[in-house]
UniProtKB/Swiss-Prot annotation:
Residues 230-254 have a biased composition (Polar residues). The keyword Transmembrane helix applies. GO terms for molecular function: transmembrane transporter activity. Glycans are attached at N3. One of its GO terms (cellular component) is vacuolar membrane. It is a multi-pass membrane protein. This is Autophagy-related protein 22-1. Residues 1-29, 229-254 are annotated as: Disordered. Its main location: membrane.
Length: 614
């Protein structure tokens, strides 16, 4: 019989940890300190995506490139558009100019004149430079996430990789303080490194959640009753290879291996699996929602601090570099508690007798597992339709965000503090949207797919409104069609509302189409589709901007990009998808274990906005 550990935390929980399933398996109950470490990293890193990527990083890259560029109109006159040199043009005072950009939107103003730079002899718009940088960082991020998933899931590298990526990303962000405009290419490199490391570290952070849930004292003390199967023995050989076994080595499954097997031996797989995991999913949602809330609170606090710093330092290029340093410092500082308090929680060795311990074997295993999942998806028509729609929709969400910030800066002349405020408004609207869409869905008795369609239609209003600026009658008014800075604020509200709904309902809708027992593998494919799609949209917007010399024509592309998922989503048949998924699950149930995909467990975690609605 397994002896209970004698640590104070375990005694306080009054639970006996199950026996290890493999050498090095850490089955100790989740402690409050471990949870605090997990929350701490959300508090640390969430500021990067909200404050840096959502506000200050794109405009910093554009501004530094602008100061080294020349006017598009004659390709000779330098674009010396520092924020401080223009501040005196407004008599309203430092704080009032946050909301008053009318002085800078006149034709020929250095703030709104389109500027170009030359990289390897190629002419690039300064706004396009920021978009290309983002696309490249997302591409590298997607490759890295797939490649490292094997090492993160199998072996003792999970925590080590998280800390390494956090340190590299935070230091890269802090180094912006030393990047002067003539080194803008170095700034682009730091942006790529920091965004790549952020994405990788957050995926690793998400991989801890199912482990924290699985070994939570509430669940470990409940073996044998409630939603946990009874009569199961914690056999240390339960992960042995053999025909007919499910993936017992998947480190982030909410149920332990013996629970997964019982869940599929009692008849109707779908209903049994749901009943066995309901308690785990409730706890997972609770912990994840707490982490989301903590991360958002930290992001809002730092965003407010950044706006104050930018205003008080007169909104110069140095102001932008300074706030990026503060963002990196925040990220670095609050990573320390996570590094101290999170347990390593090693994963099992690579299965099937594969050679382990080398990075090449981990990478090969990860890519082969992804390939198996992709091949399996070919037989699920509705999942293919949904993933195609999600690919386009996710790309549209990411592209609209970056395009809007750069459009507001380069064509509306909005100052950094005002751009930061737009992001705060959108985030608050997103939290409200995550809750309000569920109310709308219940009120009008909408299915998940219908709610997604409603969100898409509302989202389509954003680029269509920008296209109104091409209509001569509206253009002559001098407002409407994104001709005035104040118009960005209501559009920020719409964007936030849509984000809150789409992120919640798309994931839950996709979950209905997944074969029972293969959630982690298919959610990994969902996450990779999400991450990888953002490579294309920003790059295409950059190409359009280079071609026409301004960002507004890119609204045509954005309108098409957002509209394309609509017919695909309407073609998805949920009932047919469920039948196909269950049939495939039954077909694969008796296959040898080596055919069962395990890839992508590190992404098996609801994302931030998704859990707000649950």
């Amino acid at each position: 019989m397994q002896n209970c550990t004698n640590s104070p935390e375990d005694q306080a929980a009054s639970v006996c940890p199950p026996p290890p399933q493999f050498p090095g398996d850490d089955t100790r109950p989740t402690s409050k300190k471990e949870l605090a470490g997990w929350y701490s990293y959300g508090w640390a890193a969430e500021v990067f995506t909200v404050c840096a990527m959502g506000s200050f990083l794109p405009i910093t890259l554009e501004q530094m490139a602008r100061e080294r560029g020349v006017l598009l109109s004659d390709k000779k006159t330098p674009c010396s558009a520092t924020w401080s040199s223009l501040e005196s043009t407004s008599p309203s005072g430092t704080w009032n100019t946050i909301f008053d950009a009318t002085a800078f939107t006149k034709p020929g103003s250095p703030r709104t004149s389109q500027c170009i730079i030359y990289i390897l002899g190629v002419e690039i718009n300064t706004a396009s430079f920021a978009m290309y940088t983002f696309s490249l960082s997302v591409f590298i991020q997607a490759i890295l996430i797939i490649s490292m998933s094997g090492a993160a899931d199998h072996g003792s590298y999970r925590k080590m990789l998280l800390v390494i990526f956090a340190l590299i990303g935070s230091v890269s962000t802090m180094l912006f303080l030393a990047v002067v405009p003539r080194l803008y290419l170095l700034g682009g490199l730091f942006a790529i490194i920091s965004n790549t490391c952020f994405g990788a570290s957050f995926v690793l952070l998400n991989s801890f959640l199912p482990l924290l849930v699985r070994y939570h004292p509430i669940l470990m003390g409940g073996h044998g009753d409630g939603d946990i199967p009874t009569g199961t023995s914690h056999d240390s050989t339960s992960t042995a290879d053999g025909p007919g076994q499910t993936d017992g080595t998947e480190t982030t499954s909410l149920l332990r291996p013996e629970q997964n097997r019982n869940a599929y031996s009692l008849g109707d797989e779908t209903q049994v699996f749901a009943s066995k995991t309901s308690q785990e999913l409730k706890l997972s949602t609770k912990l994840s929602s707490n982490g989301i809330g903590i991360g958002y609170i930290g992001a809002v606090i730092l965003q407010a601090i950044c706006i104050l710093v930018v205003v008080e330092t007169h909104q110069t290029t140095f102001s932008l570099r300074l706030v990026l340093f503060l963002i990196g410092l925040w990220w670095f500082t609050f990573t320390i508690p996570a590094a101290m308090w999170l347990r390593a929680r090693p994963g099992p060795p690579l299965p099937y007798g594969k050679e382990s311990g080398t990075w090449t074997s981990y990478m090969a295993y990860a890519w082969k597992s992804l390939g198996r999942t992709v091949m399996r998806t070919r037989h699920l028509r509705d999942i293919l339709l949904f993933l195609a729609a999600w690919f386009l929709l996710s790309d549209g969400i990411a592209t609209v965000s970056g395009t809007a910030v750069l459009f507001a800066k380069t064509q509306l002349g909005m100052q950094p503090a005002a751009l930061g405020l737009i992001n705060v408004i959108a985030m608050i609207a997103g939290v409200f949207g995550a809750f309000s869409w569920s109310f709308v869905s219940r009120t009008f008795n909408l299915r998940a797919s219908q709610t997604i369609v409603a969100c898409i239609i509302l989202f389509e209003l954003v680029p269509l409104y920008g296209l109104l600026g091409f209509i001569p009658a509206i253009k002559s008014l001098g407002y409407l069609g994104l001709q005035q800075p104040w118009e960005m604020y209501p559009l920020g509200v719409i964007y936030g509302l849509v984000m809150g709904g789409l992120s919640s309902y798309c994931r839950s809708f996709f979950g209905e189409l997944i074969p029972p027992g293969y959630e982690a593998a298919f959610y990994a494919l969902y996450a990779i589709t999400d991450k990888g799609s953002s490579v294309f949209g920003p790059a295409i917007v950059g190409i359009i901007t280079d071609r026409y010399g301004e960002i507004r024509p890119a609204f045509v592309f954005l309108a098409v990009l957002i509209l394309l998922p609509l017919p695909l989503m309407l073609l998805v048949d949920v009932e047919r998808g469920k039948r196909d998924a269950l049939s495939l699950s039954k077909e694969l149930k008796g296959r040898p274990r080596q055919e069962v995909p395990v890839y992508g467990a590190v992404t098996h975690c609801p994302s931030h906005s998704e859990n707000l609605a649950e």
